[in-house]
Amino acid sequence: MNMQKLRIELGEETNDELYDLLLLADPSKDIVDEYLERGECYTAWAGDELAGVYVLLKTRPQTVEIVNIAVKESLQKKGFGKQLVLDAIEKAKKLGADTIEIGTGNSSIHQLSLYQKCGFRIQAIDHDFFLRHYDEDIFENGIQCRDMVRLYLDL
């Protein structure tokens, strides 16, 4: 099967379609707005269709974090998520980072698999992160999302 290659570019503006994607990965608009102000938002296009998004944020000297990454639901399971992760890794290298980090929920089974397949390793678990930072309970894959699983990749 020939996988379509995404066109990934620095996002110029934030609109409802982009917010819908960002909110797939993070249900808090306030938190999304906060890291959009501080990070760089990259949009991914399959032809003329917005297919995905990720946000890179410099968190410490020599370290960047993918603070949000999402693929449009109708386009998931087509390898686009992997393209986004690999693009973020390349961008981090070009920024001179030594480490790239990402965090996801304990219930995000597919994401945990993807990140490890891309070379990330589990670094830590922030217990009850989602209970402390989100007003609404989050459920995914029939599991309550409670803990943040932190992963890293040395570049």
Curated annotation (Swiss-Prot):
Where in the numbering of this chain does the N-acetyltransferase domain appear? Answer: 6-155
Named from the GO MF annotations, one term is:
acyltransferase activity, transferring groups other than amino-acyl groups
UniProt: CoA binding residues: 69-71, 77-82, 111-117
**Keyword annotations for this protein?**
Acyltransferase, Transferase
Note the PROSITE patterns from the entry. Answer: GNAT (PS51186)
Matching InterPro entries, A to Z? Acyl_CoA_acyltransferase, GNAT_dom
Query: Record's Gene3D superfamilies?
Result: 3.40.630.30
- Going by the entry's taxonomy, the superkingdom of the source organism is recorded as Bacteria
EC number, UniProt record? 2.3.1.-
- A Pfam match is Acetyltransf_1
Q: What does this protein do?
A: Probable N-acetyltransferase.
- In Swiss-Prot or TrEMBL terms, this protein is called Uncharacterized N-acetyltransferase YvbK
Q: What is the organism field in this record? A: Bacillus subtilis (strain 168)
Gene that this sequence comes from: yvbK
